[in-house]
């Protein structure tokens, strides 16, 4: 291909590569096909370029997590995720904190999403084994498996040497191993320090907009910067997004960042409803893993007071005119199959 159409998130141009195995007589014995793309990444004067153009990366972190199937995401779910990401103007995903299934990368090639592909060596900042020589080969082996499998996917923008696994020499070994197998891509590392000496693309993670401005925008480290995690959107968080991106657009060395995170990982649990026999009919649910226990001749509902409780949601049709509320509960264990009891207000 003399002048290939370049692959980007905006123009996901793909080509089919076919390989045939023939015997000396010219008879075909085997044939395989795969999809590839052409692109080129560079770092010049601290700026990250894709196909000769400075690139800004607006990413999300995402676990391989399904509410019904656990760590198994079917194609329909992946497509739904990618369509939502594209709809809201995200152009990248950091696969926290391990390589995704192969179908994930195939669809990223198709949809046009940059992937920051991550080695699965997380120690989550509690057991740092990256300085121990007996773990070096494990770091290298996990890196090899990822790079050898994924290096032909055009969606892989750059690699990550892992997440929160300390700052030891094994991180350097991981990056060395990866570069020996794929010299065309750059490396970052999701550590909790500002940067690691071996990475091509530095952090920080979770800076304030002012810290991002001071540490990177006018800092002395000349490497490009990517916030592999920032703006943790738990609960009602997510403020100051515009402040971050004003800094990112103001300084060419700032590539962008990956918001934590796209989908909160969790499994669907059965919620048992509690009937409100008062005139208010307020929604309430039995939460946790409360159990029925024998108490003398009776069977009662045991709530331990920590992770088991009856949760009563605020209802607009309930008006309280004082600082006191009396809650009366009447429990009928035989109804636990469909409803776990009754709640009445007095």
Each model region followed by its residue ranges:
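Secreted/periplasmic carbohydrate-active enzymes, especially glycoside hydrolases
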Residues: 1-107, 111-115, 142, 157-158, ...
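Short beta-strand segments enriched in hydrophobic/aromatic residues
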Residues: 21, 119, 331-333
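Short edge-strand/loop segments of extracellular domains
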Residues: 38-39, 344-346
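Short, isolated positions in well-ordered beta-strands
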Residues: 29, 55, 279-284, 308
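Substrate-binding/catalytic cleft of secreted carbohydrate-active enzymes
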Residues: 82-85, 92-271
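Extracellular glycan-recognition modules
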Residues: 274-275, 283, 287, 291-345
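Aromatic- and carboxylate-lined catalytic core of secreted/periplasmic carbohydrate-active enzymes
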Residues: 15, 253-256, 261-276, 288, ...
């Amino acid at each position: 291909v003399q002048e290939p159409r370049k692959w980007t998130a905006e123009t996901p141009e793909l080509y089919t590569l076919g390989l045939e195995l023939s015997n000396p007589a010219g008879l075909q014995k085997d044939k395989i096909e795969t999809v590839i793309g052409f692109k080129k990444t560079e770092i010049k004067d601290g700026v990250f370029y894709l196909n000769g153009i400075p690139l800004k990366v607006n990413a999300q972190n995402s676990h391989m997590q399904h509410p019904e199937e656990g760590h198994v995401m079917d194609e329909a779910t992946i497509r739904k995720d990618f369509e939502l990401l594209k709809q809201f103007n995200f152009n990248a995903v950091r696969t926290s904190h391990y390589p995704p299934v192969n179908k994930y990368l195939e669809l990223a090639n198709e949809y046009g999403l940059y992937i920051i592909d991550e080695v699965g060596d997380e120690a989550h900042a509690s057991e740092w084994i990256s300085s121990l020589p007996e773990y070096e080969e494990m770091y290298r082996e996990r890196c090899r498996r990822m790079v050898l499998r994924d290096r032909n996917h055009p969606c892989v923008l750059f690699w990550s040497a892992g997440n929160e696994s300390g700052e030891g020499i094994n991180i350097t070994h991981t990056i060395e191993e990866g570069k020996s197998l794929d010299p065309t891509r750059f490396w970052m590392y999701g550590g909790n320090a500002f940067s690691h000496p071996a990475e091509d693309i530095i952090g920080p993670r979770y800076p304030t907009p002012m810290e991002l401005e001071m540490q990177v925008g006018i800092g002395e480290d000349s490497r490009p910067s990517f916030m592999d995690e920032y703006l943790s959107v738990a609960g009602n968080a997510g403020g100051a997004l515009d402040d971050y991106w004003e800094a990112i657009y103001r300084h060419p060395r700032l590539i962008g960042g990956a918001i934590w995170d796209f989908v909160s990982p969790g499994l669907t649990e059965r919620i048992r409803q509690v009937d409100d026999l008062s005139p208010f009919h307020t929604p309430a649910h039995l939460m946790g893993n409360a159990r029925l226990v024998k108490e003398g001749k009776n069977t009662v509902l045991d709530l331990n007071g920590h992770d088991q409780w009856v949760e009563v949601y605020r209802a607009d049709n309930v008006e309280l005119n004082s600082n006191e509320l009396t809650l009366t509960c009447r429990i009928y264990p035989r109804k636990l199959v469909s409803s776990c009891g009754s709640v009445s207000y007095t």
